[in-house]
Amino acid sequence: MKKYILALDQGTTSSRAIIFDKEQNILGVSQKEFTQIYPNQGWVEHNPLEIWASQYGVLQEVIAKTNITQEEVAAIGITNQRETTIVWDKNTGEPVYNAIVWQCRRTAGIIEELKLDKEFSEYVKENTGLLLDAYFSATKIKWILDNVEGARERAEKGELLFGTVDTWLVWKLTNGKVHVTDYTNASRTMLYNIKELRWDERILEKLNIPKSMLPEVKNSSEVYGYTNLGGTGGVRVPIAGMAGDQQCALFGQTCFEEGSVKNTYGTGCFLLMNTGEKMIHSKNGLVSTIAVGIDGKVQYALEGSVFVGGAVIQWIRDELKLVTDAADTEYFAQKVEDNGGVYVVPAFTGLGAPYWDMYARGAIFGLTRGANRNHIIRAALESIAYQSKDLIDAMQEDAGCKLTRLKVDGGASRNNLLMQFQADITGAEVVRPIITETTALGAAYLAGLAVGFWKSKEEIAEKWAVSQSYSPNLAEEKKEKLYKGWKKAVKRAEGWEEE
């Protein structure tokens, strides 16, 4: 009897495995952290074999822990850190280099060179939906081919394969039989034409990347292959769903309709809006990406990210030592009625969308003699909501629609003061679901739909339940005054590092 879906959630700092039942209850979770490698300033790597070992380890652990049998697992769904790049030998399975992680800035020089070709920059934006940036996979592959001895020659002979983390996991789970990715992960490589749904020859040629390295692009929900979960029974379990982490969170939040939006409050914030079958080109520095691909049809999304979201709370705790526990920020922030005119702009590494200012730096503005610890803590929390509002306003303008409801998840979404302020400052209802494991849940949904475990998106949406909702409760005049203060503070922080 098929009773469960196993979701593999391969993140930037840890690998997790979660078991869901048909009612979307979580039966068990296993998690294992793995090594972050920093060979040079601004470089970030992972060992691909350690990614695999940690992911396979938690898969076996969660099955043992929950005492379920392989026969009871209907399917496996995969969600993953996006853009991270792995190149390996297709005969031996040995990686030729460490995985180059999405955060890694080593290819910034290659990007600057490419940007000199204005026509090419425009072509990339128009056809991949992305801005030329070291964040995406394309220049990471080029770097490996150019810098690892013999790599280019081997790639041209068809001996090397490229994959994002989803591709690597499926390849390992199927013992090297299956080399695939899904539409969402392909859309983050900067090599995939999201209008025509194909690898883009012009970009491949410009970067000198052999097409033979690339995986086949499949739906986000279909059976890609089978794996044996390591028992003696030899039961073959289908691997049936796959999408990048932010797209999975959008799907896990049941944002199936055009115009629906979710915000994940993690270290940074990731805001995605489903734009349906329309690919919208942002005029506000957002990227266009594929939200999901099912039955050969894709839905698109607009995506914006805040570099420093929950990380501002860590800064308050670890560097300023204003609290000993991140959860205490709510308690102290509530001790004051408002921010007392204080604004924190956490531009520690510059500002992302819609500003895109790499030279902005963090600052605290509006201090008076009466400003105290609580005002600074409150202003830090509010900065997360202001930055999210900046993105929401940009999205509304690009999509030509008004947001009435924002679905939220991620660690900082548990902070009630922050969520209430988010509702107040955006004028939209903010909704937190009962299951906040939305990324893994999205992967489970995709896999479950492919094998008939759940019959339809409608069945899934019916089971999606609200834990708490926050309605806007701030006078328009007060809202405008607060936001105007934020805009003024950002203006002062911009361009700080420039000579």
Curated annotation (Swiss-Prot):
Its EC number is 2.7.1.30. InterPro entries: ATPase_NBD, Carb_kinase_FGGY, Carb_kinase_FGGY_CS, FGGY_C, FGGY_N, Glycerol_kin. Sn-glycerol 3-phosphate binds at residues 12, 82-83, 135, 245. GO terms for cellular component: cytosol. SUPFAM superfamilies: Actin-like ATPase domain. The keyword RNA-binding does not apply. One of its GO terms (biological process) is glycerol-3-phosphate metabolic process. Pathway: Polyol metabolism; glycerol degradation via glycerol kinase pathway; sn-glycerol 3-phosphate from glycerol: step 1/1. It is an enzyme of class 2 (transferase). It comes from the Bacteria. It catalyses: glycerol + ATP = sn-glycerol 3-phosphate + ADP + H(+). ADP binds at residues 12, 16, 267, 310, 411, 415. Keywords: ATP-binding, Glycerol metabolism, Kinase, Nucleotide-binding, Transferase. ATP binds at residues 12-14, 267, 310, 314, 411. Glycerol binds at residues 82-83, 135, 245-246. Activated by phosphorylation and inhibited by fructose 1,6-bisphosphate (FBP). One of its GO terms (molecular function) is ATP binding. The keyword Ribosomal protein does not apply. Homotetramer and homodimer (in equilibrium). Belongs to the FGGY kinase family. Key enzyme in the regulation of glycerol uptake and metabolism. Catalyzes the phosphorylation of glycerol to yield sn-glycerol 3-phosphate. This is Glycerol kinase. The gene is glpK.
